[in-house]
Amino acid sequence: MIPHSSAGVQSWGQPLHAVYSGTGRADLSQPLGQPDRQPEQPSMPVPQLQGRPPALIDLTTNDGDVLEREPPAKRLKIDVHAGSVAGDGSPASAGVGESKSTPSATTSKPPSLSWRARPVWSFQALLSEVSGSAEINGESAAGVVQDVKPPPPPSFPGPPWKFAPADTIASDSAGAQDGAPSKEVQTTPYHIETPSVAPVIRGEKVADFSPWMGNHPEDVLNEQTAKQGYYDRTQVSQNESNTARPSLYAQLKHRSGLQILSSVFAAALEKRQGHNMVTAPSTFKPPPRVTLTDNKREAWLRDLANPNVPLRKLSRTIPHGIRGRVLLDQCLTKWVPVGRAVWLAKCVGANEIRAFKRKGTSGALAIGLEAKWVRDWTANVQQFLEGVITSCGVADWKMKMTYAVSLTARLFFEQLLDHDQYLGWFLTSLEAAPFNTLPVWLLMLGIYWSNILRYRKRGRRLAELLLDKLQVAIKSDSATSLRPLTDRLSLHIRKLTLEHTSSMVLPQSWEKYKDLLSSCLDLNDNVHRAVFQNLAERNARVQRPRKCEETTQQPPQQRVIQLFDSIGSSNDITSVSAASLGAIDDKAALVLKLLEWAATPFRYGVSRVYTGARLLRKWKIAGVDVDTSIISFLGESQMRDQLNMDNIYHIVSELVRSQTFSVGKYLQWLMAKGVADFPQNSDHQPLSGDLALLMQLPVSRLPEHVHNLRNTLLHRAGVEVSKESSTIAILKASIAERLPRIFGSVATSAVSRDPLPSDLTWAVKSELGQWIRRGVTEFGRDPRRAFQDLHSAPSAEHFALTPGEFYTVRDILESFGDLSILADVLKQATVCNDGIVLASAADTVNYHFRSFCVIGATTDLFKRLVESYARLKRLGSTSLDLIFSLIDLGLRLPGELNTVALLRQDLSRIESKSSMAAPSPLSDHIPSSFNETDPLFLLKLDQLLSSASGIDESTLDTIFNLLIKQIESSGGHAKLSVNETCRYLSYLRPFHPKRFDIMIVRWICGLLRSTTGGILSQVLPPLIGVGCVTIQAFVFLVRRLLKSENMMSNQRDLRIDLLQLLVPPPAGQSRYFDMVTYRFHLSRKEFLFKHPEEVFDIIRDAIALIDSQSQEGNYRQVDLGHSAMVLLQILLTKNPESAVKHCTEKLIGQHPSAVTVLTRALDSLLGLDTKAGERLFTSNGSFIFITIDTGPAAPDISVAEKVIELTNDFSLPFCRLKLQLLFNAETKGDVRNEIVDVMFKAAVADSRSRRSNWVGLVRLMSHDAVRQIRERAEKNFFAIPLFEESPDGCSSFAADNSSSLETAKLYLAIIEKLAYSIPDVGPQAVVPVLTEKMDLLLQRLITMQANYSGTTELSHGVDAEHMIRSRTQFERALAFWFSALLRMIVLHRTAFSVPSAAVRPSALPEQTRLLISIFCITLARLPDSVLRLFPAADYFPHSMTAGDCRPCPGILLQTHALDVAASLIDTFPDEARHQCARYLREKCPPFARVQNDSRFLYLLGPLGDSPSSNITLPVSIPSPAASGSTPAPTPSGNPTGGFSHPQQPAFVSGVPTGLPDGLNCAASHLCLQYRGRAIGAYPVRPWELLEDAAPIAGTNDTAVSLGYFDARRVRV
């Protein structure tokens, strides 16, 4: 059955009614006969006053009160009433066919067929049920209390014409409540009318209805009728007077009695069905339009606005000229009720559309003209609504806005507009709406919310639109006043995110809006947080890297290395220890990484040794097996060549001293391993790393048996133990000879005056260091020395260290590198009263600040030094040197700022006292007495500087000039050293600081301008050491002079001297420095740490002089290159990342010589083969340079390979810099290709080893080289076969194909890391390859499904197990390749876009094929549901464990595939989408059920939902002949067979056209029947769903003949 012409689609805002809930049938929403509790809605909106519009309504609500003045929803069935047949034309007949709006009547609940299952024998049965229910309702109170007896049988029903069904009564009563019209004057004589409820019998007669005519026998009044009444005396036989049971029982008892009875009943039903069948031809035609005058047209419109005027009367004279925008404006002006306005629009539209077919046009042209007319009509509606919105602020604007929105919404939901065009215009208008009209559009958004979000094409656009509006509102200047609007936008965004999450998958704009979206959600709520995490993961998987970026999540090894490097600045050992233990689960690997960090040549400083020792102690306490890890580290022979093993032995020595390392365990392991027996004379045979540790172990605290075992193992290994003892004895004698006061005098013959050897073992160093510490401690508290003079009080001077002794002890311990012993010596030195020693001790702590901080001695030593300073202050012997040193040291201690402030107060007090003291009259004669030839010159100078009186400026000038002459003459007759002279200058400065600074600057400028070479390098270090000059100020002065005075004759020497000033001495050189020289080294070290950028500038300016012409020969060039290389190595190892950045900015590309020196420095660090120009180490540690080639070195392919092999976590910055130098060199194309080959092999090897160092190396290459590496990886990836077939047949696949999958995964990882090299337009060559691969994957899936389904029933036993195993392997491989190809599609998505596809004619078929393959594989129903696994972070599926209860464990592979398809559909043209949907509708594989999948419709819709594309009913199909029986059901054959019918070309491409977008609409299930079977869907034409289309309603007054559907009349 199809709807009546008065029926329609679901009205706006009203729920659908049951399809079969008409009058005369049981209403499923409530008991039969029970009155409807919901008040009836009036059929048309009646204004309160004529011309007054309705009140403003809420446009976003979805309740029934929105249409409180709208007609109720139409019944979706055929109701042919007797009243309508009579056609009296009364107003009451206009309401026939309108049903009540019951909330519970929905289309989801099928109607009851009780009235069709049993025949209605009489209207008594209907009345019986009505009376029974009414009785129950009337006695409900008593029935609840007294429900002990069974209910009595229903009473005998009365005649049907005395009572009517409850719903008819209710409708009549509701209609009576409407506005009572004025009673019409009868113009014709009264005649008797037959009751509409009376039963009709054959011959159009009515049963038991005899109206009074005056001539009936009972109307004759006589004596008999007066006495006895009138009655019919019918002759009744005897049988009729008795019961019929005996006669019927004989028939029923017979064998065929029931069949006869059934035949009788079936014949009766067949007769009734045939009698009720609609056989009349269709009499429907749209109401005609007539030409009227303006006055009559206005009168007609006023009648249309009056709800009391029936539409049937108005349908006779619809005026011409009311169409389009005029129609809508007239309805708005006259306040025509919305329902009647829609009726007028339908009448006009139906006539306009039928006009196209009456002109003799072809079918295709008529459809095109209809589509054009609908689009024009939609444009008129849009203009009408825009005009009302723009008239904001005028009178009655709210009421007009309410009416306009209601009318347009009703037109939209009545399917009278082009949905795609209208919703597209709505989104465009919403996007362009300013803030003052945006609330109106947001209100209308609530009306079309579900229609917009039904398909992704509109939903994604709406999501981005709302987010953009919210972002603009938040960032606007009037954000406070827009707060209600932003709250409204946030509410819409939150609702969209929670209810339509897939619309928030935004591949192009997620990074832009993700923070804004998170602010709209309540992340404290578990649901909101889970949804946002799911969205973030889904969006991350469909995005490709836009640029070269470092990985956000570092490997654990890189993380712990950063923690180790951070100790130098934070000095927080405890937190770094805990963080390191939590970063790596494998504690042995953690210990190995720490030892590598401490011994690598790519880090700087001895503080790493003490950092490693302290961390290992903490880890040992935490339960880590440190001993085993150290022993296994030493057993790896490949590590010795790349590491400084002396640092490792130093760490073990520190651990042995603190009894943290188990020497016994190590010796047991060594014996278990076996010690090789070396001959005694094999001195040239190097020992292995684990055996060399045996020589390094300190033996002072070892038990005797362990000591003896060590000596035994050393003797077996060929090491002379006695040689170690003799070495210790000789060195002790040498040290004692240099420190006789501490260790006593020794025989001169036993003393070796050679410097201490540099190859001492830590066994010797530790023994000597402990011996020195013990000697210094005993010397400081020896009672014999303290009390040798009983008559004099003991003084600290008797047993305190002198400056010379302190310098010697410090020099010895620093040459050993034993800073822990040096810290104990400094602690003993703090008890003396010598200001020089205390100042030198403070400078020593400052020089080794990082190491002492790790040891934990810095704060204690500083406090002891401050206490010593306080003691000296009380004694009146304040030392400026000590104050300067303490201030410099205290500034590096954050917790000692108060102490530093006090020290600065003392310093300023002393300086102000000297500068403000008045000079005595005797000072006028002082200059004449001062003479450099005077033997008492030093004595007089000391007396003058130590006196309390001041010095005038002339005296200051005289003394300054004398001291300057002493410096220039290298001591003069007074025999002052340069250091002592500079110290006197520092004592002279506090008297007149400003004048002194001016004089010293003038003198230094004179030295810089002079041609005398070498004097600056001798004078400047002492001046820096005493504090008269700073390195930074001197560098600034030199640059200023070089810029202002371009004609300086010695610019080259000045630059070279400045460079050499910053170069520290070699490690093997003696470090016996006095206080002034030591302070200079401290200042140079601080300058290198704090100002690396300026040092690089100095190196760049000095290296540029190598190529210039010089008269000094090659020696000066070699010296310059060596100095620059040493400085570069120090800077690179102190802070690798920033140093590499400075090298790239300041050296590479600036000068060829700079590249050459940088290359040599890197080669020395990386340990590459030495070449011409590289440094060679001699036995004493000095450097010898041969030559330096100033031209750029040609890159060697072997060098690149070796650099790549040397790449690890520590050398990565240096290897990157080295490769960058190789890539930047001007070489031929074949060499570049070879380098690309090397890098590709390195990338594959590192990826297979799960390392990521190759990424940093490849990033340095040019964009073209990176593209070549990625293309090679893509080529190898596509070359891997999808499935490896086993040799036994093609139906089963190899069980072990993990190797090919791992290889593919490796190449895919390389491609993904280099995805930033993919151009924005996308490589076109990869598109057909990806399409073919995905198509091949689908074909394999179809083949395997067919093979498995064909062999399932035949296989059993071992074959069945083999088949199951083969199928499982196939599905796993399918999931892997599917996820891998999806990732490739994501990376190359831009290649499929429309601009790129425009240059290829095959772009559209490729896009369609790709979508089809993705949909078919995604929605395939595999036995193991492998596509429903959770992909891991690398996009490959893995099973989820039962205990994994994370709130967002991941997205399904199926969901990810649909997201990829959505991202493609966003960029594909609509034609590709339509072709994909058409193919899937017609030829979808049987294992993929996409037709009824909501996700499929969401992604591929909308598919031609314009009503203009409706299909006209073919005239050649005749009406099915009524066979007198119910038509046979549709055959259950191929469900898609009907979709390929040539008469249905439009419906197979998507959603039925002309219907609402929802698939639950009842009209979308109507099927055209032909010869007893359904041949296709019938699209209802919304323009012809007209009620009251004709003045007299006929039996078949519908737009299409009801005979096509075997429709039957329902008599009520």
Swiss-Prot record:
Biased composition (Basic and acidic residues): 66-80
GO terms for cellular component: mediator complex
One Gene Ontology term of the molecular function aspect: transcription coregulator activity
SMART domains, A to Z: Med12
Family the entry assigns: Belongs to the Mediator complex subunit 12 family.
Protein task: Component of the srb8-11 complex. The srb8-11 complex is a regulatory module of the Mediator complex which is itself involved in regulation of basal and activated RNA polymerase II-dependent transcription. The srb8-11 complex may be involved in the transcriptional repression of a subset of genes regulated by Mediator. It may inhibit the association of the Mediator complex with RNA polymerase II to form the holoenzyme complex.
Protein name: Mediator of RNA polymerase II transcription subunit 12
Protein's organism: Neosartorya fischeri (strain ATCC 1020 / DSM 3700 / CBS 544.65 / FGSC A1164 / JCM 1740 / NRRL 181 / WB 181) (Aspergillus fischerianus)
Lineage: Eukaryota, Fungi, Dikarya, Ascomycota, Pezizomycotina
